Swiss-Prot record:
Protein name: Probable chorismate pyruvate-lyase 1
Catalytic activity, EC: 4.1.3.40
Lineage: Bacteria, Pseudomonadati, Pseudomonadota, Gammaproteobacteria, Pseudomonadales
Protein's pathway: Cofactor biosynthesis; ubiquinone biosynthesis
Primary role: Removes the pyruvyl group from chorismate, with concomitant aromatization of the ring, to provide 4-hydroxybenzoate (4HB) for the ubiquinone pathway.
Designated gene of the protein: ubiC1
Compartments, record wording: Cytoplasm
One GO MF term: chorismate lyase activity
Amino acid sequence: MDTSHYWSSRPLSELTGSEHHWLFLPGALTPRLKAMGDYSIEVVEQSHGPLNPEEAQALNVSPNTIGWVREVVMKLDGEACVTARSLTSVPALNGDWADLNGYGRRPLAEILYTSEQTLREPFQCALLPPGAPLAALSYRYAPQAERLLARRSRFTRNGSALLVSECFLPAFWARVEYAQALKSA
Protein backbone atom coordinates (compact mmCIF):
# COMPACT_ATOMS: atom_id res chain seq x y z
CA MET A 1 0.00 0.00 0.00
CA ASP A 2 1.41 3.39 -0.97
CA THR A 3 1.02 5.61 2.07
CA SER A 4 3.22 8.49 0.89
CA HIS A 5 0.21 10.69 0.13
CA TYR A 6 -0.80 10.55 3.80
CA TRP A 7 2.32 12.37 4.95
CA SER A 8 2.11 16.15 4.84
CA SER A 9 4.56 18.93 5.61
CA ARG A 10 1.57 21.10 6.50
CA PRO A 11 -0.60 20.58 9.57
CA LEU A 12 -3.71 18.53 8.90
CA SER A 13 -6.89 20.61 8.98
CA GLU A 14 -8.49 18.42 11.66
CA LEU A 15 -5.70 18.88 14.24
CA THR A 16 -6.46 20.45 17.59
CA GLY A 17 -4.06 23.06 18.91
CA SER A 18 -2.54 20.52 21.26
CA GLU A 19 -2.10 17.93 18.50
CA HIS A 20 -0.44 20.52 16.26
CA HIS A 21 1.87 21.50 19.12
CA TRP A 22 3.09 17.94 19.75
CA LEU A 23 3.32 16.88 16.11
CA PHE A 24 5.51 19.84 15.16
CA LEU A 25 7.36 20.35 18.45
CA PRO A 26 11.04 20.80 17.57
CA GLY A 27 13.83 18.84 19.20
CA ALA A 28 13.90 15.44 20.82
CA LEU A 29 10.67 13.90 22.11
CA THR A 30 12.37 11.78 24.81
CA PRO A 31 13.10 14.57 27.34
CA ARG A 32 9.55 15.86 27.00
CA LEU A 33 8.16 12.39 27.66
CA LYS A 34 10.45 12.00 30.68
CA ALA A 35 8.93 15.20 32.09
CA MET A 36 5.46 13.60 31.89
CA GLY A 37 6.10 10.48 33.97
CA ASP A 38 8.28 7.43 34.56
CA TYR A 39 9.72 6.88 31.07
CA SER A 40 10.79 3.53 29.66
CA ILE A 41 11.52 2.24 26.18
CA GLU A 42 11.04 -1.28 24.86
CA VAL A 43 12.61 -2.46 21.62
CA VAL A 44 9.89 -4.42 19.84
CA GLU A 45 12.01 -5.36 16.83
CA GLN A 46 15.38 -4.55 15.35
CA SER A 47 16.11 -6.35 12.09
CA HIS A 48 17.13 -6.20 8.44
CA GLY A 49 14.70 -6.60 5.56
CA PRO A 50 13.46 -5.05 2.32
CA LEU A 51 12.12 -1.52 2.66
CA ASN A 52 8.66 -0.93 1.24
CA PRO A 53 8.48 1.46 -1.75
CA GLU A 54 7.29 4.44 0.30
CA GLU A 55 10.06 4.02 2.88
CA ALA A 56 12.67 3.59 0.14
CA GLN A 57 11.43 6.75 -1.56
CA ALA A 58 11.61 8.71 1.72
CA LEU A 59 15.22 7.55 2.15
CA ASN A 60 16.09 8.26 -1.51
CA VAL A 61 17.16 4.66 -2.13
CA SER A 62 16.01 2.07 -4.67
CA PRO A 63 12.80 0.13 -3.96
CA ASN A 64 13.37 -3.17 -2.17
CA THR A 65 16.70 -1.94 -0.80
CA ILE A 66 17.61 -3.96 2.28
CA GLY A 67 17.14 -1.77 5.30
CA TRP A 68 17.68 -1.72 9.03
CA VAL A 69 14.40 -1.29 10.91
CA ARG A 70 14.01 -0.55 14.61
CA GLU A 71 10.58 -0.47 16.21
CA VAL A 72 10.08 0.65 19.80
CA VAL A 73 7.30 1.52 22.20
CA MET A 74 7.81 4.34 24.68
CA LYS A 75 5.91 4.06 27.93
CA LEU A 76 4.99 6.44 30.70
CA ASP A 77 4.32 4.86 34.08
CA GLY A 78 4.15 1.49 32.31
CA GLU A 79 1.52 2.61 29.79
CA ALA A 80 2.28 2.59 26.03
CA CYS A 81 2.12 6.20 24.85
CA VAL A 82 4.27 6.49 21.70
CA THR A 83 5.44 3.99 19.12
CA ALA A 84 8.36 4.68 16.81
CA ARG A 85 9.79 3.15 13.67
CA SER A 86 13.27 4.13 12.54
CA LEU A 87 14.95 2.92 9.39
CA THR A 88 17.92 3.37 7.12
CA SER A 89 19.55 1.40 4.35
CA VAL A 90 22.08 -1.28 5.29
CA PRO A 91 24.86 0.54 3.36
CA ALA A 92 24.13 3.66 5.45
CA LEU A 93 24.07 1.52 8.61
CA ASN A 94 27.52 0.23 7.76
CA GLY A 95 28.73 3.74 6.94
CA ASP A 96 27.49 7.08 8.25
CA TRP A 97 24.99 5.51 10.67
CA ALA A 98 27.32 2.79 12.04
CA ASP A 99 26.68 3.96 15.61
CA LEU A 100 23.17 2.47 15.33
CA ASN A 101 24.57 -1.08 15.17
CA GLY A 102 23.59 -2.86 18.38
CA TYR A 103 22.03 0.32 19.72
CA GLY A 104 19.76 -1.52 22.12
CA ARG A 105 17.27 0.17 24.44
CA ARG A 106 18.68 3.68 24.49
CA PRO A 107 16.64 6.47 22.91
CA LEU A 108 17.92 7.47 19.45
CA ALA A 109 17.87 11.09 20.63
CA GLU A 110 21.17 10.35 22.39
CA ILE A 111 22.94 10.25 19.02
CA LEU A 112 20.63 12.31 16.82
CA TYR A 113 20.99 15.53 18.79
CA THR A 114 24.62 15.29 19.89
CA SER A 115 26.37 15.20 16.51
CA GLU A 116 26.90 18.36 14.49
CA GLN A 117 27.08 16.15 11.39
CA THR A 118 23.43 15.13 11.81
CA LEU A 119 20.89 17.39 10.11
CA ARG A 120 17.16 17.13 10.69
CA GLU A 121 14.65 17.93 7.97
CA PRO A 122 11.24 19.46 8.80
CA PHE A 123 8.53 17.28 10.29
CA GLN A 124 5.74 15.74 8.30
CA CYS A 125 2.53 14.56 9.93
CA ALA A 126 -0.11 12.00 9.05
CA LEU A 127 -3.33 10.41 10.08
CA LEU A 128 -2.02 6.88 9.60
CA PRO A 129 -3.97 4.49 7.39
CA PRO A 130 -4.35 0.92 8.70
CA GLY A 131 -1.88 -0.47 6.14
CA ALA A 132 1.05 1.75 7.15
CA PRO A 133 3.89 -0.11 8.92
CA LEU A 134 3.81 2.29 11.89
CA ALA A 135 0.04 1.79 12.19
CA ALA A 136 0.51 -1.99 12.40
CA LEU A 137 2.94 -1.50 15.29
CA SER A 138 0.69 1.05 16.99
CA TYR A 139 -2.45 -1.08 16.85
CA ARG A 140 -0.62 -3.73 18.90
CA TYR A 141 -0.64 -1.26 21.81
CA ALA A 142 -3.86 0.61 21.03
CA PRO A 143 -6.15 -1.86 19.21
CA GLN A 144 -9.25 0.31 19.74
CA ALA A 145 -7.66 3.54 18.46
CA GLU A 146 -9.99 5.44 16.15
CA ARG A 147 -7.23 7.62 14.77
CA LEU A 148 -3.47 7.42 14.88
CA LEU A 149 -1.61 10.70 14.56
CA ALA A 150 2.05 10.48 13.68
CA ARG A 151 5.01 12.59 12.73
CA ARG A 152 8.20 11.77 10.92
CA SER A 153 11.45 13.43 10.05
CA ARG A 154 14.46 12.54 7.99
CA PHE A 155 17.91 12.90 9.51
CA THR A 156 20.96 13.02 7.26
CA ARG A 157 24.67 12.56 7.73
CA ASN A 158 26.87 13.15 4.71
CA GLY A 159 23.87 12.46 2.47
CA SER A 160 22.91 9.17 4.18
CA ALA A 161 19.35 9.24 5.51
CA LEU A 162 17.66 7.89 8.63
CA LEU A 163 13.86 8.12 8.78
CA VAL A 164 12.27 8.37 12.24
CA SER A 165 8.48 8.12 12.57
CA GLU A 166 6.59 8.47 15.86
CA CYS A 167 2.93 7.70 16.53
CA PHE A 168 1.19 9.27 19.51
CA LEU A 169 -1.18 6.71 21.00
CA PRO A 170 -4.55 7.52 22.66
CA ALA A 171 -2.97 7.09 26.13
CA PHE A 172 -0.56 9.92 25.30
CA TRP A 173 -3.35 12.27 24.25
CA ALA A 174 -5.32 11.37 27.41
CA ARG A 175 -2.30 12.42 29.52
CA VAL A 176 -1.98 15.69 27.62
CA GLU A 177 -5.69 16.41 28.05
CA TYR A 178 -5.51 15.60 31.78
CA ALA A 179 -2.50 17.91 32.24
CA GLN A 180 -4.31 20.72 30.41
CA ALA A 181 -7.40 20.23 32.59
CA LEU A 182 -5.26 20.51 35.73
CA LYS A 183 -3.69 23.75 34.46
CA SER A 184 -7.04 25.36 33.75
CA ALA A 185 -8.64 24.24 37.04
